[in-house]
Amino acid sequence: MKKYILAIDQGTTSSRAILFNHAGQIHGMTQQEYPQIFPAPGWVEHDANAIWHSQLAVAQQVLKEQHLSAADIAAIGITNQRETTVLWDRQTGEPIAHAIVWQDRRTAALCDQLRADGKAPLFQQKTGLVLDSYFSGTKLKWLLDHTPGARVRAERGELAFGTIDSWLIFKLSGNHVTDTSNASRTLLFNIHTKQWDDELLALLDIPHSLLPAIVPSSGIVGQTYTSLFGQSIPIAGIAGDQQAATFGQACHRPGMAKNTYGTGCFMLLNTGTQAIASHNNLLTTIGWTLGNDVDARTDYMLEGSVFMAGAIIQWLRDGLGIIQHSSDVEALATSVPDNGGVVFIPAFSGLGAPYWDPYARGTIVGMTRGSNKAHIARAALESIAYQTVDVLEAMQKDAQILLQELRVDGGAARNDLLMQFQADMLNVPVIRPVVTETTALGAAYLAGLAVAFWESKEEIATQWQMERRFEPRMTDDEHAQRLYTWHRAVQRAQAWNI
């Protein structure tokens, strides 16, 4: 029997490959960073070839380091940064421009115009998304309009569009597909019919010929070229990073929720087969589709997206230079007893849910002569938790439920100070699992189910284990005062860059 699943985890700042055994444990992991490109204020790009080369390199390297071959791998599962938009030549397989990253805000004015034209309700009803430059649709339109010759070539059927999952699968196998979870992040996909939407494509002037075929999240969608790993490996699982993390956290039942603390911060609440429309500026999105085709059972999610979480810590390191390593932030923050009145609004690229203000900008308020770098570090960590509170309050209003616990993962979930503060501000227990690499684990589980490496979701759920539980311990008065101060500071940051 083949012993491992290879998870490909393509993130915003690095590409990783992780091997999982049948117990859902990590057998080997390799990571490689690659550069982000910032050609103008508010613009963020990637070289799609740099993504491909780094991802292939770590996949090959992890097999080599563990003295394994393709014969030991039952399947590949792919998870990816979502919304990031790639446009490439079908014949050569080469990108015709840099990829536009999910953080990129260049199409904010286009979204403003579409809202002014009264199109926001149509987009929300069909896609479950707010009309924001965060999503792929307006990014793709921008590429077609601003890349010389792109629109003519697209009309001739020479070009292919995809999010990062599509791009990697094309490079691995030659197939042009995407799963329902990634498609649901494009502003072009009807989450109810589970098909590309002709009306929305026409509104954004996007040719249907560009689009990948829609496939389930769990199922064999292609075989890797034999030249890549010595023999072919089935590609059997696909999900956007946050949906994959939700699956990896075994949040398989309605009412279960997880929060991932990565570059951004993303809370997803499973609503089962019901797509709940948000009235509080959250997103309704597809979690996963399990079955032989896209008409199979689909689980929906409510999602709150926070743009800046781990990226704040990177800025403290690279922008301010007040820490040498990201892991140093907890020690610096705990060197002072509190934030000293400092509040940090990390709206470097606007504010996400529930504000959706692309014109908000990063703000630090409440500083005095007594403020120092430790207060700023502590306020930066606290801002991650505060943004999560804003999302949860909106989520509970939409779903009409009170959360019983929050499962957490991602790099910053290893920060005990942040997790305790998160429990205090949410006023619910925060639970950290033994395996915090749940994004890659979710992709592995989806692939493993497709090839019978695991038999069922129930078997997967038994593998989930708690590492630590953080109980809330803040007084009601302090809780209320802190939230009041946070919301005052948010108002200072909003609508700044108009």
Curated annotation (Swiss-Prot):
Top-level lineage group: Bacteria
InterPro entries in the cross-refs: ATPase_NBD, Carb_kinase_FGGY, Carb_kinase_FGGY_CS, FGGY_C, FGGY_N, Glycerol_kin
Entry annotated with the keyword DNA damage: no
Residues noted as binding sn-glycerol 3-phosphate in the record, renumbered to the chain: 12, 82-83, 134, 241
Catalytic activity: glycerol + ATP = sn-glycerol 3-phosphate + ADP + H(+)
Binding site for glycerol: 82-83, 134, 241-242
Binding site for ADP: 12, 16, 263, 310, 411, 415
GO CC terms, sorted: cytosol
Family listed: Belongs to the FGGY kinase family.
Cited function: Key enzyme in the regulation of glycerol uptake and metabolism. Catalyzes the phosphorylation of glycerol to yield sn-glycerol 3-phosphate.
The name this protein goes by in its record: Glycerol kinase
Organism this protein belongs to: Herminiimonas arsenicoxydans
